[in-house]
Amino acid sequence: MKKYRLILAGLLFFTFTSAAAAGSGNYVVRAAENSPPPKIDGALEDPFWDGATVLDQFTQYEPVEGGPPSEKTIAYIGYDSRNLYIGVRAYDSNPSAIRACLTKRDEVMGDDEISIYLDTFNDKKRAFVFQVNPCGVQSDGVFTENRRRHRGGGFDRIDTSWDTFFLTNARIDNQGYTVEMQIPFKSLRFPNAQQQTWGLQVRRNIRRRNEDIYWAPRSRDINGFLVQAGTLKIDGPLEKGRNFEVMPVLTGIQAADEKFDPEPSLNLKYGITSNLTADLTVNPDFSQIEADMPQVDVNQRYPLYFPERRPFFLEGRDIFDTPIELIYTRSIVNPAFGTKLTGKTGKTSLGFLSAYDETPTYIDIPVEGDLESLQQNNRGLINIFRLKQDLYSESYIGFVLTDKETGRGWNNLTNNHNRVGGVDGHFKFDDVTRFSFQIVGSNSKVGETATGWVPAMNFDLSRQSRHWNLTASYSHLP
């Protein structure tokens, strides 16, 4: 299938000159080291906060860009060797109108909220996001600057399927509300260095007014979010994420007079360094994972898309993202075991995943005969390798290789295969102009039928400024 798209949209005028910078370079703070740690009760009354770094210069982004906020906001940042502590006093002239609900984790988007963005590698591409509403309900995720719309139709650049451990609490009072956060350094990935320089953005949303305010000002003259963030400096040493987690699981079933049928499983996670993590799973038990939302499967041209929720596949998932979505881990249905290595060293991000699947999805190509019978009772070995090299501000070049071998048993895994290799990249030319591309080839074989190498490609050139958006794209998909 070939798709050609050329979209021109605008309101007033367009200029091909580079837009002015947002001035976030002036928003640089150094976190204050302090002790003893505060009690995370949402009150902001501990002496710890008296010595914390203060952020009180906030600016509107919506509805009036650059305007003064309708309500005052003060943020406090401090740390010790184990945790980063963030407190916020959100003043409100009408506290009874604050929108806050007790809801499930990661579902605070309809409420007033405080959001913290931590770009721990300061590469302007990816940030950890921590959110809390005035009731203390948490939300966390990973923000990816150039995340594209996936097959399920989603487009949010915050992937909330990522969950980590952090503490929050909040209180509503007659002045507005206060929140406190404790973010363990073990929950983050960051460079192995004595001095840390992170990207930082603090956001407050006043829902009833549709008002967004930021510590580091945002401008529509700049195409990008993290490039407009401020800077947080932390003087180490910090407790690194060299942690070791072991999670053994035992489930079983016994019916009537039958013997008890045990089903053991094991999950291991090891933080090799503060920015490199290894995972191992053996016979994983996914029975406690939240069920998928129902979808209509009648008259569907393509297979249904379901989001990934299984913990083993979520660690470092953003590393495997590509403009054309090549890696869909839900196709690994019933892994007997799997290993994974993800992280970043210097300017290089890497990901490797290998899994042995006892019920793999079919390799879908035109064949002579019945496709299902040719692959029935197969087993599968899936290997995925991903490498991304940072070049300069918001730009990278990446490579991806995937290999899926299936057959009836470990010794016959070369009967069928699907292999994909490709290169992709993203380049920022100035504040408003970007270019991204991906070129891949795939080769499949089922029984005696082989496809040869099948190409696919995507090119996107965009120029987004305050009043005009220009996008030119070309896609060729088999």
Region roles according to the model:
Residues 344-346, 430, 464-466:
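Short strand-coil-strand connectors
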Residues 21-390, 395-399:
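Structural preference for beta-rich elements and adjacent junctions enriched in aromatics
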Residues 246-256, 264-266, 350-358, 369, ...:
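Transmembrane beta-strand segments that form the barrel wall of outer-membrane beta-barrel proteins
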Residues 255-259, 300, 329, 371-378, ...:
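Alpha-helix capping and helix-loop boundary segments enriched in small/acidic/polar residues
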Residues 1-8:
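Bacterial N-terminal signal peptides that target proteins for export
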